[in-house]
Design a protein with these regions (language model features):
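Anionic-ligand binding patches
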Residues: 3-9, 15-33, 37-205
Length: 205
């Protein structure tokens, strides 16, 4: 059955992620509401894959809000580290004794990459949307942006690993790109574009 939700709960308290997805979903006429504004606690993320964690977060947000929900699980997969940190990206720096933060994640990554010549990496995003906590047919979209880890921070836009993710085809990092340019190329932008198409055909038709 098709539906046209006017509000969609975002299962994240990350302000950068909320702003980015709000811009990407504006064309649907749907208001994205951060789960924190509804006093919804963060869900557990016990799984080893992005899709399982995103689904768990979406179901959790929908269960506690009674609204359709969307969740993003994203991370950095570094070739030289056999695909890690992966689903543990947000906590990457904590294994090296740093408090959890974007700044410390970037600092720890650059420190661990000193002397590493294989700098290829991918930022991966998986978006999952559910109509209800029991939705048997969640919408799933993925995006992947491949680049190279820089040796220093470049650019002051964006968030997360944007200042260290060099995109060779553009000759700059995500943090050096205007928002519209980044959204067209980024992992989250790719996933959001695919999710928009799914929603338009399945929920809004």
């Amino acid at each position: 059955m098709s539906m046209s939700p006017s509000r969609l709960v975002l299962a994240s308290n990350n302000a950068g992620k909320l702003a980015e997805l709000q811009a990407l979903f504006a064309s649907l006429g749907v208001a994205l509401v951060a789960q924190s504004t509804l006093n919804i606690p963060e869900a557990d993320e016990p799984f080893h894959t992005f899709v399982e964690n995103a689904l768990a977060k979406a179901r959790h947000a929908s269960l506690h809000s009674g609204l359709p929900a969307i969740a993003d699980d994203a991370g950095l997969c570094v070739d030289a580290f056999a695909g890690l940190p992966g689903v543990q990206t947000a906590f990457y720096c904590t294994q090296f004794g740093y408090p959890k933060s974007d700044d410390n994640n970037r600092k720890a990554l650059l420190e661990q990459m000193v002397g590493v010549t294989q700098r290829r990496a991918a930022l991966v995003s998986t978006l999952v949307a559910v109509r209800s906590a029991q939705d048997p047919e969640p919408l799933i979209a993925t995006g992947r942006a491949v680049g190279e880890i820089t040796t220093e921070l470049l650019g002051d836009k964006g968030f997360g690993f944007d200042p260290v993710m060099w995109i060779p085809s553009m000759g700059k990092t995500f943090a050096q790109m205007p928002e519209d340019e980044k959204n067209a190329l980024s992992h989250r932008g790719q996933a959001a574009k695919a999710m928009l198409a799914l929603m338009q055909s399945r929920w809004f038709s």
